[in-house]
């Protein structure tokens, strides 16, 4: 690539593609942009114990809160980096980013080969990041990750909404699969 003067971009599904490069690509059709909102709802059930633990799956709500404080429950990794990448691509300066992680509480039994979640326990983590520009929210990324969302009427998928000229809305369901991790 260097000898030919070209760039090569390699990405994962998320982070990398869905809540990063795909948003940037879609923004290219806009003459101006007022805001960007994106959400990725995925099913964690194919993933292993390391990923499930990082989302607090199987914990009590109290243990989830303790895990947030201790740094063992992390939610999605990479929201600040994704936001800064998007902002740089569209020419925005970001003042601050606020992140929020909330437990998704199961109302029914949800089970994977690695964990059985009872009603009242944590089935996943809703992680949201909001970037501000000139005091206003300008980029919102949301990632509710949980095991078997369909058991309570949830549907996996990826959604991107760009408010601008023109408005752009892209929705895909089911989610673009990211592949199981450890």
Spell out what each predicted region is.
Residues 10-12, 16, 91, 164, ...:
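Glycine-centered flexibility sites
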Residues 1-44:
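A contiguous active-site-proximal alpha/beta segment in oxidoreductase catalytic domains
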Residues 5-11, 70, 173-181:
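A short glycine/serine-rich beta->alpha loop
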Residues 2, 57-63, 167-169:
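Short amphipathic alpha-helical segments, especially helix-boundary/capping motifs
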Residues 1, 147-182:
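C-terminal helical cap and adjacent loop that interface with cofactors, partners, or active-site loops
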Residues 18, 78-82, 182:
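Catalytic-loop motifs flanking and including active-site residues across diverse enzymes
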Residues 27-158:
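Active-site-lining helix/loop region of Rossmann-like oxidoreductase modules
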Residues 16, 41-46, 67, 168-170, ...:
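Residues in flexible loops and secondary-structure boundaries
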């Amino acid at each position: 690539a260097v000898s030919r003067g070209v760039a090569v971009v390699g990405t994962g599904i998320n982070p990398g593609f869905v809540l990063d490069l795909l948003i940037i690509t879609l923004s290219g059709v806009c003459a101006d942009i007022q805001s960007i909102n994106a959400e990725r709802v995925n099913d964690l059930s194919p993933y292993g114990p390391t990923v499930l633990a990082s989302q607090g799956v199987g914990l009590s709500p109290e243990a989830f809160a303790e895990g947030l404080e201790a740094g063992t429950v992390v939610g999605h990794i990479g929201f600040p980096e994704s936001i800064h990448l998007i902002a740089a691509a569209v020419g925005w300066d970001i003042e601050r980013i606020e992140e929020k992680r909330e437990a998704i509480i199961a109302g029914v039994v949800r089970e994977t080969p690695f964990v059985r979640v009872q009603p009242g326990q944590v089935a996943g983590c809703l992680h949201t990041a909001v970037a501000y520009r000139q005091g206003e929210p300008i980029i919102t990324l949301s990632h509710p990750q949980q095991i078997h969302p369909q058991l309570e009427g949830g549907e996996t998928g990826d959604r991107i909404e760009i408010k601008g000229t023109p408005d752009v809305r892209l929705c895909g369901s089911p989610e673009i699969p990211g592949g199981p991790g450890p």
